[in-house]
Amino acid sequence: MAKRKKKKKVAWQSQLTFELVGLGILVIAVVALAQLGTVGETLVRLFRFFLGEWYAVLSIALLVAALYIMVKREKPPLWSRRIGGLYLMLLSALLFSHVGLFGQLQGNEGFSDQSVIRNTWNLFWLDMYGEVQHSDLGGGMIGAIAYAASHFLFADGGTLFLCFILFMAGLILLTGHSITDLFGKAIRRTYLWVVDFIKGTWNEWKQFRKESKEKLEQDRKLLKERKEKKAAKRSRNEDPAQEENDQPLEIVDFSQRVSHEAKNDATVKQQVKPAKQEDQVSKEAPEEDKLASQGQEGEEMPTVSLATAVTPNDDYQLPTIELLKLPNNPNQSMEKRLLHKNAEKLRKTLESFGVKAHVSKVHLGPAVTKYEVNPHVGVKVSRIVNLADDLALALAAKDIRIEAPIPGKSAIGIEVPNQEVAIVTLREVLDSPQAKADRNVLSVGLGRDISGEPVFAPLNKMPHLLVAGATGSGKSVCINGIITSILLKAKPHEVKLMMIDPKMVELNVYNGIPHLLTPVVTEPKKASQALKKVVAEMERRYDLFSHSGTRNIEGYNEMITRQNEKEDAKQPTLPYIVVIVDELADLMMVASGDVEDSIARLAQMARAAGIHMILATQRPSVDVITGVIKANIPSRIAFGVSSQTDSRTILDTGGAEKLLGRGDMLYLPMGATKPTRVQGAFLSDEEVETIVEFVVAQQKAQYAEEMTPTEETKVTEKVDDELYDDAVNLVIEMNSASVSMLQRRFRIGYTRAARLIDEMEARGIVGPYEGSKPREVLVQAQDDEASSH
């Protein structure tokens, strides 16, 4: 009896335990499904951590398990054939959900980490802290682990296929039927429908082909006739230059010029030469009228020099562009064939170093081909820049330059030298539609950029230009191209030139052209004086502007033009003045102080006065291109240099050391953040001589005496300062001269001491100013007495 009671008690306790456990699980399931209170939200977050957006499946499973425990009063089975099928189908759903989540993570810049598990963990904690409103967790951590393993083994495509296989396997285990039993009828019906559709479509296509065959033949005949008519019309009325400009630069070589114009090139030159002698005779009379008219003007305005007021010569004709040679067309077919091959090499080379990127665009330039590379999300630009040598090795290139990034684009430019360099001529640059539409007389042609577009430099907007590069890099050709561009567009009364050529061989060919203010200055000592005269001219112009109430040369010339329309006496307008220094380094060696001061003053103030400078040097060191010069000349052109240090001296950035030479340049205009790579326009000596002969035949040069540097005469007047003789004796005795020394010894002010030093320099006692070094004493003790007279 006691044993029976004990068994009933144990059975009752077991039933009570199952019911209590079932009720507890039921409470958890209901609270989680309804998200009741803080406990419900916590359970939901816990379920989402494991199953992601499929968290409701776990709540439903707990609900079913609770009911099973309370009804059956036994533990629910955790594994069976059907339950295993449900497991596989759930795993397939979790894996598929995480495939979509991984695509979102790749497109989100905020998650650059490639680990799916870490990204899922971060998303879960962002959701926990409330920083993200119900973020998508995909398949939760279970899905993340499954996807990480599947993606590592099978990639994205294999993962999707694995999802399908898991789902089908789970469906088979759940239903207990094979695939044929489940989908056999549907597959057979689909197969029969596809067969019927293909047969019907085939019959309709055969009928359509039969009916349209005759119509197609008729259309071909009509199209052939139209093409023949268009070809005949084009041969009669076609404009070769316009056809060339309409051709896309990406497909056709930019350097190809119309061959029909080359036939007329020699004829044009023969017609131009006889006209030179006639023009030379007809220009003498207007020159006399100029002098007479200039003598009658200037009564209402302050006195203006001949250099600043020139009466226009109505008979002057600008040189025609036909005087320049047509370019020879290089064969770039090999470069075009290598474009796709090199683009694929770039992609594979970057991929071999773990850099995912693709080439989106290619620019075939005259000397360089530029590949635009778009890196994938998460790839640092510095990784591609650091692979410059490896990319050059893969492409078998001499050297490559990387522009990272390209301004205005989300791409990196990789510039690879061409095997065949296409020569860009000045004629094709100045014959472009952009040049014809530009009416600015100071807009000079530089060459073509990598995409084949012509590049122009408006000198009046720069307002000054610094050109630097090693010997043989194309610097002198660039200077000749700038001067020739001005001669082709500007008349002598519009632009005046002052040329300084210490080498005495580069610019002497321009002696005699009417645009010159003075003959080409070849002596370095006279060059310093010439720059001082330009500074004086600038001051005269500003004095003229102040009396006339204008602010710049454009406003003054407009005022003169309006007055000439109302009055009979014609007043001349002011021309622009372009100062060209071919070798700045030689001038800085002879008289660095005076030259730097003059250049600094012109660079700071000469823009409004219409005075612009072009400084060229082949030694881009800091003692030549000083900080004062760089600060006031923002526009620079850098040709090939030997080191990155020289490149930084010119452009404040590297890149010029990787240029190819032969006109390859980096052009940095004022306001630009990065330099533009340009293939400079080539101009032969024969073309320069032809242009100069034409210009000289049109009008003779009229040099301005007040702008011509003269020999410095020795000062003989006595110095009006009682300390001068004592100062000379002190300087000779100490064999050193400085303003501070005179201030200390004689206890005088800076102005008086500086005046004494200037008087000694004017009389040849001490040398010129040399920066921080003391001045050199040029006389001996026995010359002391004579120096004071």
UniProtKB/Swiss-Prot annotation:
Essential cell division protein that coordinates cell division and chromosome segregation. The N-terminus is involved in assembly of the cell-division machinery. The C-terminus functions as a DNA motor that moves dsDNA in an ATP-dependent manner towards the dif recombination site, which is located within the replication terminus region. Required for activation of the Xer recombinase, allowing activation of chromosome unlinking by recombination. It comes from Halalkalibacterium halodurans (strain ATCC BAA-125 / DSM 18197 / FERM 7344 / JCM 9153 / C-125). Residues 275-291 have a biased composition (Basic and acidic residues). GO terms for biological process: cell division; chromosome segregation. The keyword Membrane applies. Homohexamer. Forms a ring that surrounds DNA. This is DNA translocase FtsK. Keywords: ATP-binding, Cell cycle, Cell division, Cell membrane, Chromosome partition, DNA-binding, Membrane, Nucleotide-binding, Transmembrane, Transmembrane helix. GO terms for cellular component: plasma membrane. Residues 173-789 are cytoplasmic. CDD domains: TrwB_TraG_TraD_VirD4.
